[in-house]
UniProtKB/Swiss-Prot annotation:
Palmitoylated. It holds the Pfam family Tetraspanin. One of its GO terms (cellular component) is plasma membrane. It is found in: Cell membrane. PROSITE patterns: TM4_1. This is Tetraspanin-5. It is a multi-pass membrane protein. It comes from Homo sapiens (Human). Keywords: Cell membrane, Disulfide bond, Glycoprotein, Membrane, Transmembrane, Transmembrane helix. Interacts with ADAM10; the interaction influences ADAM10 substrate specificity, endocytosis and turnover.
Length: 268
């Protein structure tokens, strides 16, 4: 009579190595983002003078790379090592951290819907604050130029917002050649032109409004962003729902792996 062998609880190799493989990619992406951010700061001399971090009056886009890279690095490290070494502490940390991010995203989405007007005012303030610092940082300048070109807009609510910048304002004390003008990214594009005319915005705001509409974008970036959001609401909502489902899936997998590991240890 052959004896029956009892097969105890096992750790799922599929779940273990799926979490490991996914987080290895996440980890390396985090390192890449951090590397880009630190390289950008080194190029701007920030690493040799840390106090200069607070000198910029506007938003430094490098912070996006550093914050996103830091979060991805921490998550990737915890998920990767936790799965490979079957470390329940790191796996639980991974689940909790991912859960906190999910909760913050959900809270931000609800607050953005409830306080739409307040968000709009803050966006207006944010853009105008960065308009003031347009020439202070090359990364900020490139971000503003990209935004205005992509959404075909100028300023927060119109081209006159550029009066806030010391180089573009129309005051008599402004001796800049850019006086009463706008950046080239506000200019309407001629498809036949291959070379960008960086002086196309000179004196643009001295012209009558009818003539301004021919040479520059007169709509503000806040209303243009609102329009873009309404036109692409299904896509944007789909992306956010997809990210949320991935986060929930990651939490469930990590918790499943923790349960397997604890069950195996309990059977020893």
């Amino acid at each position: 009579m052959s004896g029956k062998h009892y097969k105890g609880p096992e750790v799922s190799c599929c779940i273990k190595y799926f979490i490991f493989g996914f987080n290895v990619i996440f980890w390396f992406l985090g390192i890449t983002f951090l590397g880009i951010g630190l390289w950008a700061w080194n190029e701007k001399g920030v690493l040799s003078n840390i106090s200069s971090i607070t000198d910029l009056g506007g938003f430094d886009p490098v912070w996006l790379f550093l914050v996103v890279g830091g979060v991805m690095f921490i998550l990737g490290f915890a998920g990767c090592i936790g799965a490979l070494r079957e470390n329940t502490f790191l796996l639980k940390f991974f689940s909790v951290f991912l859960g906190i991010i999910f909760f913050l995203e959900l809270t931000a989405g609800v607050l953005a819907f409830v306080f739409k007007d307040w968000i709009k005012d803050q966006l207006y303030f944010f853009i105008n604050n960065n308009i003031r610092a347009y020439r202070d940082d090359i990364d900020l300048q490139n971000l503003i130029d990209f935004t205005q070109e992509y959404w075909q807009c100028c300023g927060a609510f119109g081209a006159d917002d550029w009066n806030l910048n010391i180089y573009f304002n129309c005051t008599d004390s402004n001796a800049s050649r850019e006086r009463c003008g706008v950046p080239f990214s506000c200019c309407t594009k001629d498809p036949a032109e291959d070379v960008i005319n960086t002086q196309c915005g000179y004196d643009a705001r001295q012209k009558p409004e009818v003539d301004q509409q021919i040479v520059i974008y007169t709509k503000g970036c806040v209303p243009q962003f609102e329009k873009w959001l309404q036109d692409n609401l299904t896509i944007v909502a789909g992306i956010f729902i997809g990210i949320a489902l991935l986060q929930i899936f990651g939490i469930c997998l990590a918790q499943n792996l923790v349960s397997d590991i604890e069950a195996v240890r309990a059977s020893w």
